[in-house]
Amino acid sequence: MKKLVLIMVGLFLLTTANAQDKAALKAQKAAKKAAEKTLKEVRNIYEMSIPNPQYGRKETNFDKLETALPLVQTITESEYTKDNPQAWKLATDIQIQYFTKIENESKADPDNEEIKKKYIDSSSKLLNYCIKYDSLLALDTKVKPEEKVKEHKTYQTRGVNAAVPLLQAAQNYSNSDKQDELKLGVLYAEQFIATMDKSGLMKDFTHQELAGWKTYAKAFRAQAYLDIKGTPEDKIVSSYEELFDSNFKGIAYQSLSNYYRETDKAKQNKYLQAGIEALKDDAEQKDLRANFVTILMQNQFQGGDVEGFKKTAEIMKTEYADNDNTVNAYLMEGQIAFEAKDYDTAKNIFLAGNEKYPDEPKCLLMAARSAWMKAQANGSKKPDMEEAIKLFKQIEAANPNDPELWGESLYVLYNNTQQPKLAANYKKYYKATK
């Protein structure tokens, strides 16, 4: 009896399971049928909304087409139609109508910010639809190869037309002073880059400006990242390093140099040095390279990197002799020798600087002071003192209205060389309190 009960229970469970399976299968069939019906409904709405001379429609009926929008969301999300290429083709074709409409509105009113945002949103959505349709079409075995090629080219063109406004938006937003807009700059730049580099839609796209477009997008992204508060260091660095092989390399090295200016001199110098090397043969960025050399030279001088400084200063002196900052190479190099108490070398460096840049009084002044220090170090021998006097007299001749450069020094030097009559001419400049 117990065995019979168990058999009856087993049969009951099997019957219940079969009933549930049948109910589930029936529900699935109903859902699939409903999804396919929705797909047909969307197609009918689309075809009855777009211009068609046969039915006397010269323009798109957007009031009618709008009724398809919630249905488009249904067919692109339903598990029964979301992998159907035709669902995404319809979504794309409908979006093209709105994209074209908003594009025309944007051209008619280019300063309208609300229309601009709608245009960019429409562009982004259209591009995503084109990519999705193209990817599903490639897997559809029912479509002939030649038809696939034709469709691919058609929707590739539409995708490009949608991508270009995203590049323009990335440029605009990356120059904003608003954090939310800077983030949009990154978003649209990355969408453009990913589309061109990774999507099947663009795998065979060729255009003479394509490489330039991608470089611009990367530059806009880097600029936005730099200005967004809290952007991780690695994102900023990597985004600019991607530009090292482009025509934006100068800006990239400059931006990274500035990024580390206050926080890490070693890293700043690293990018300055790399920038100097990268721009070595770039005539168009000669001034920027000279700026790199100037900053690196100053950093090395202030940081005590004497050997590094000398190499950089040599670049400045030999390659940028006409640059206003080159005189500093002589002044700093002379200062290094002066502080090392190599006064003769210091004097010669300062004199070389004075010969090339006579309008900079510091060169001759430091040469004179070096000569005086040499004299003091050698026991104040008269020939050495006379050399210092000669240089201070040159300063007086060149700067007669600036006695603070030479007056007191000549008074002391003449006194120390037992020339009281000459010293008397400069006594008025002597500060007895010193």
Where are these regions (language model features)?
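Canonical positions in the second alpha-helix
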Residues: 75, 133, 192, 242-243, ...
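Bacterial Sec-dependent N-terminal signal peptides
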Residues: 1-27, 353-354, 434
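Amphipathic alpha-helical repeat scaffolds of TPR domains
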Residues: 26-53, 81-106, 139-177, 184-195, ...
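Residue-level detector of the short coil/turn that links helix A to helix B
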Residues: 63, 177-180, 229-231, 263-267, ...
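Hydrophobic/aromatic packing residues within the alpha-helices of TPR/SEL1-like helical repeat arrays
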Residues: 65, 72, 127-130, 189, ...
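Intrinsically disordered, low-complexity segments enriched in Gly and acidic/Ser/Thr residues
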Residues: 305, 310-311, 317-402
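Single-residue signature of alpha-solenoid repeat helices
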Residues: 68, 123-126, 185, 236, ...
